[in-house]
């Protein structure tokens, strides 16, 4: 049983306002789960502007953060920062920074096997990988791929908008969701500083806007969250060929909802029994049951996030809590997750955090 007093939570935030968000934060915020199970604030730590999305390497005590802007002078665009964290106190120290190879990097993913990170640059529509050393500092060998294309939504899909990257379970392939191109593009990986080789594309319904992606724990099924249509494409994953095949498209919002449509994040429970996604506008978490035979989804219900504009959310390391980051309410609301039904219920714990965007747990 994990000692709950040694669980850290890092929160990525907006520190500079953008057209879609009014920033209130100063950097990356750290919390520690106390003996009573409640999160207590440690401090905030400086980073690049808008350290929104994070990823962590628990074994090497490393944290990487996007700098989601387009005007860092030394880079001519966005950036990414590398931090070490103290395993005893959770304190962060920024040790390096690097150009993201584009504008508005909105997602970072760690590739531990190759000691490199991958970035999705939303505004410029590109993917970049950057290798790093054991100390977290970046080394030579960055590789950039520029996406080309558009789709039917003239306001949001006038060009490519890479939104996330995800490694497949074998670590052989990288899946890049591009909201502007209506596709999840699959790349094969080659070495720590080698190229990304385009292998296949999953093309979703026009105007869907793929945003985030998650694999089922069995590695055979995958889930593409579409921001603009508020749908999920359930896919079969062929790990030999590196291909995705959609077998179901399901709505995330109630049929009678006529308000804003904008999904944000998706996660499959470690048990594989349930999948969850966040809905901005509706300000909710959608709860699905996962069919044990084919991975398809059945709607179980919706749970209000008790705040405005839920972005990323995180399942606790034990899988018995869900933490929802309400960007425009400056709160993280904690829900109990029923291990028999998958349903959520508010615990009453509300963590104050300015403009929270991304949540990452670290066990020590």
Enumerate the language-model features and the residues they cover.
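Beta-rich, blade/repeat-based domains predominating
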Residues: 48-58, 101-116, 148-170, 204-221, ...
């Amino acid at each position: 049983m994990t000692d709950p007093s040694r669980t850290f939570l890092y929160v990525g935030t907006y520190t500079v306002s953008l057209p879609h968000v009014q920033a209130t934060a100063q950097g990356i915020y750290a919390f520690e789960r106390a003996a009573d199970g409640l999160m207590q604030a440690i401090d905030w730590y400086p980073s690049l502007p808008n350290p929104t999305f994070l990823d962590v390497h628990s074994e090497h005590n490393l944290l990487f953060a996007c700098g989601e802007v387009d005007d860092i002078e030394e880079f001519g665009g966005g950036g990414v920062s590398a931090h070490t964290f103290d395993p005893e106190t959770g304190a962060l120290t920024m040790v390096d920074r690097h150009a993201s190879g584009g504008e508005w990097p909105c997602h970072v993913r760690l590739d531990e096997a190759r000691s490199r990170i991958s970035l999705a640059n939303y505004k410029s529509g590109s993917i970049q990988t950057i290798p790093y050393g054991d100390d977290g500092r970046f080394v030579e060998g960055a590789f950039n791929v520029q996406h080309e294309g558009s789709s039917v939504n003239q306001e949001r899909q006038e060009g490519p908008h890479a939104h996330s990257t995800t490694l497949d379970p074998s670590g052989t392939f990288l899946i890049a969701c591009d909201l502007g191109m209506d596709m999840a593009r699959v790349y094969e990986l080659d070495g720590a500083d080698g190229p990304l080789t385009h292998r296949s594309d999953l093309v979703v319904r026009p105007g869907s806007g793929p945003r985030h992606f998650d694999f089922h724990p069995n590695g055979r099924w995958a889930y593409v969250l579409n921001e603009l249509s508020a749908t999920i494409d359930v896919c079969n994953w062929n790990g030999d060929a590196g291909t995705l095949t959609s077998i179901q498209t399901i709505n995330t919002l109630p049929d009678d909802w006529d308000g804003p449509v904008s999904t944000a994040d998706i996660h499959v429970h470690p048990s594989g029994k349930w999948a969850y996604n966040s809905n901005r506008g509706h300000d909710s978490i959608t709860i699905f049951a996962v069919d044990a035979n084919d991975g398809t989804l059945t709607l179980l219900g919706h749970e209000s996030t008790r705040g405005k504009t839920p972005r990323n959310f995180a399942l606790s390391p034990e899988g018995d809590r869900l933490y929802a980051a309400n960007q425009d309410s400056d709160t993280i609301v904690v829900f109990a997750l029923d291990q028999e039904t998958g349903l959520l219920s508010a615990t009453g714990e509300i963590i104050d955090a300015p403009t929270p965007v991304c949540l990452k747990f670290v066990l020590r």
